[in-house]
Each structure stands twice: as structure tokens, then as C-alpha cells.
Amino acid sequence: MQLPALQSAKLIRRYKRFLADIELPTGDVMTIHCANTGAMTGCGEKGDTIWYSHSDSQTRKYPHSWELTQLANGQLCCINTHRSNQLVFEALQNKQIKELAMYDEIYPEVKYGEENSRIDFLLKGKGLPDCYVEVKSITLVKGNLGMFPDAVTTRGQKHVRELLAMKKQGHRAVVLFAGLHNGFDRFKIAEYIDPEYDRLLKEAMEQGVEAYAYAGQFEISNEIPTALSLTESVPYIK
């Protein structure tokens, strides 16, 4: 997935969930939009180097968006979780998700379920059961362990219930954890943050719901991040 043209700055603070103040190389201070409403643990500390994009839209109050954080150890994290579906869509198109590579038709944002939900991707293939794929972003990393969620997610809990219902109807149901951080090689659910999500997903997996985690990799050109892609599945620690 190609990233938009990026510029760097230093993070001053994040506030009101959707806003962040940054210091430009010139010393000027600017307010930008933050699309991530999660806790962003470890990915948004004062003084961090961040990368932001610019939009030409005339309707936006804040034309710049926080895209990536560069951590002190040099690792990168895409904090704009709106990018995750585009990342997975390209991986599905390119048959990079080996567990789903047999499907040829990809339908994004399809209404389904009993709780007024939209599935991120509905996959179809000749002679195959329909496959419902819910995408979750991995931005929380400790050591080399990627985790989800970084905050209690009642929405995520709902999605697990919906996926289990699809599985009981004879379809495939998959949670795909996509690496937006390039610092992990293993994955587990952060049960200490959301024990209910952990419980629901474990119960759903016992009944046939599938879960996979894929690592992310950034491309760098002239010291500027230019692209992000999913590379390979990593061990899922239950």
C-alpha cells in the first residue's frame, strides 16, 4: 500500500481524541487530525517523531493528518487505522493472505448480522462457503509481541458475536489482525486490557471462528516512509 506524501514533525500532545499539536522543523506549531480513537499506547508520546500527510479537501477543518509514529528505537507504527482496510484489501487481491487465497471475489463493507453491522470484507469463490473477514489493527507492541486491543472494545466484542453467528450458519468467519507496526513477530490478545473480548474470541474460535495475525513492513525511500505491506503470518499465542 502506497502511503501519501509524508512530512515529519515532533509530537507535542494529543487531545480531544481527534486532534494533535505538533512542532514543525521550523519551530512553528500546527494542529492536525488524528484518526485513531484508541489509547495508542506507546505510539503517541510527547517528543515522538511523527509523520503527517496533507489533504487538498476544501471541506476539512484540519487539512493535515497524523499517519505514522517513529519510535525511539526506529520502529514505525501507522496510527491511522483507516489505512488498515486498504492494506488488507491489497493483500487479498495479491493473494498474500494464504489462508484466504482461494477466494476470487472481494466485497468490502457489506451489511450483515443481527446487530446492525458491516463486515470489512465478504469473500466469495466457486464451490466455497462465503467468508466473512473482520479486520483489526495491531498497533500495541511490547518487546516483540503484538497485541490487540489497546483499549476496551465493545465494538470488537460485537463483531465477534456477529462472526460466530455467521459460522453457525455454515459460513467461514475470520478475524484478521493486520500489523500496522513493524516491531513484532508474535501476537496475542491483550486480555489484561479487555478480558471480555479475550473470552468471547476464545469461545468463538473453539466453535470454528478463525483468527490470523500478519506482520507489517514499511518501505523507506530517502529516509521517508513510502509504503506499508503485510508480509507473513506470525505465531498466534492463545
From Swiss-Prot:
Domain of life: Bacteria
Cysteines joined through disulfide linkages: none
A matching Pfam family: SfsA_N
GO MF annotation, one: DNA binding
CDD domains reported in the protein's UniProt record: SfsA-like_bacterial (cd22359)
Stated family: Belongs to the SfsA family.
Cross-referenced PANTHER family: SUGAR FERMENTATION STIMULATION PROTEIN A
NCBIfam families: sfsA
Protein's name in the database: Sugar fermentation stimulation protein homolog
Species of the source: Haemophilus influenzae (strain PittGG)
Lineage, highest ranks first: Bacteria, Pseudomonadati, Pseudomonadota, Gammaproteobacteria, Pasteurellales
